[in-house]
Amino acid sequence: MRVKREHLTVLLNRLYDRGDGSFTIEHPSDEIGELVRVTLASHDSCTVRFSTGMDEYAAARQQVSLEYGDHVADDLPEAAEFRNAVIASGIIDFDNRDEIETFLDRYGDPDLMAGHPPVFAGFDTNLMPWRIDRVLGLNEPGSGVGYVNGFVLATGVRDELDWDYKCHNTDPFISAFGRSYEEYWNQPLGSARIGRLGLLTYRRIRDIEQAVEVQSDQGDEAIINAYDTYDQNQRSDIILFSNDRNFVERARAHRLLGQHVAFPNTYPRKSTATWRELELLVYMLAVVFGVIEVPSVTIHGVWRGKDQLDWQHERVKLDARSPKIEPKLEGDLSIVESYDELN
């Protein structure tokens, strides 16, 4: 069954009701195995324990490469991408959140009534897959209230994300990880899935938020030049964010306001999460890993026949491994979807 990301509460509820209030999210392979352990509680006090450190995960990924080849291992996210997916859920934070908040307090939230120029945010390519506008809290979805008045998007960022590397031979993945990888046929592999996440963020900001698209070639210098040209031609201030210090320094050399976004190098032992953050975590891990498992259910981030609408609506595919849970999930999902249609 195909499920929108915001309806994954149905799965969490069903796990809780059947006695799996504490469960693991796992990769199907023996080499990778357990990723995180989740304990469900009230809506804002669930617990996520990080079973595998970044170095430990990197070593396990290397073992996959040794046993099955680089082609198979490259489908797994790098340790940094695994961490970034967790950050995108909001469960762990950036290393320099205080510095970012100070930057936003200083340069964001302009007083337009007093004649101050509006502030627009722009991003480097490396941040786009990770729901960066939402995680930074730049404005409130729907209301537009927040630190910035809108966004500037360089088309070079879009083009750096817009590439596809699809699976046309599922046999190596089935041999390494199991029969669930039959669903990989004609679906994006590895970094291409992460690029697709970035494109979704780009298009959401462009089409739904207050955004201006500026033409640019690919590459840091071309992207920064496009932001700089827009900044000079418009009465506005642009603030740029990147995980790359060189990008930030180049932006500052153009007299643009740049802020480095630092990711942590380790996981905390555990973290508190809301149910909504757990929905995001399950969705992000399903996409970056391709396939994950929870008790009695396999969750596919990609599957044979997944199309653009499935990506746009952030759908995953649930395959019940237990005949008891499948009709209950289908019934719960039908109720939730009917409620959405009525509202």
Go through each PLM region and give its residues.
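Feature 3881 marks metal-assisted phosphotransfer/nuclease machinery
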Residues: 1-123, 127-239, 246-343
